[in-house]
Amino acid sequence: MTESFMGAGAPADASEAVVLGAALATVYGDRHPQASGAPAAIRSASRRLARFAGNYDFDIDAPFATWLRHIADGGDVNTARADAEGNRRRITSAIGAIVDRGAMPVLLGGDDSVAEPFVAGWRDHSPVTVVHVDAHLDFRDAVGGESHGYSSPMRRASEMSWVRRIIHVGQRGVGSARPADVQDSIDAGNTIVRARELVSVGAEAVAGRLVPGERFVIVYDVDGTDPADIPAVRAPVPGGPGAALLGDLFAALAARGSLEGLVVTEFEPELDPKGTSALALARLICR
């Protein structure tokens, strides 16, 4: 790691949130892990924002990044394309260590397969709800015989005893989900808030799906955002919520429940030549 998120220092006992990077977890076959450079790109973009810490932020009507001294950056989890099982184990261990200390992990992926071991980090703790922001459902049992790839993390999360339920948000268009996958998620007690509903009713109404004080984590696949705002993704789907609306949603969720962690996935720096998607993501994380 050559840069830290927002210039944050190394983790200390007093750190309230710790940023980690994970380039990949479980890659499908011989596909190129195009999101592997995302942690470095997001960190680099965040440094453009760090110089404004303390300045007025029009989106929150308050000074920007007053929390900066409370966060740390723990670098990247070691991952290797040929060691999917080891990748998942190391990511879960790193997240669990942060949760054990009472801090909040913020994981910068990486493709969406890192979401499964991220959620697994709460296995020794009180149950959490997963708020899954994504254009796709990610509820396939397996694709090509692989049950831990990026089409399956929410299916695997739903099988974890410490996951209370999943609130899917932002789904639209057509992807890998089949009718049976949608029904399976509903039958498991999960909720689907389609993109059109979020845009129609707004952030506060969707955040109201949480019980006040409910412990939750956010799994944010970047293609959940409309590609007009953040185009640098593998599977863009038009018609989604804009970055501003998602920022409002994240803030509303945090105000209503107890945010325990955040993972950001599926951003592909190779598709972001001007760095605007990375900057938008760094900004969303700061919300």
Language model regions located:
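Conserved alpha-helical scaffold segments that buttress catalytic/binding sites
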Residues: 1-287
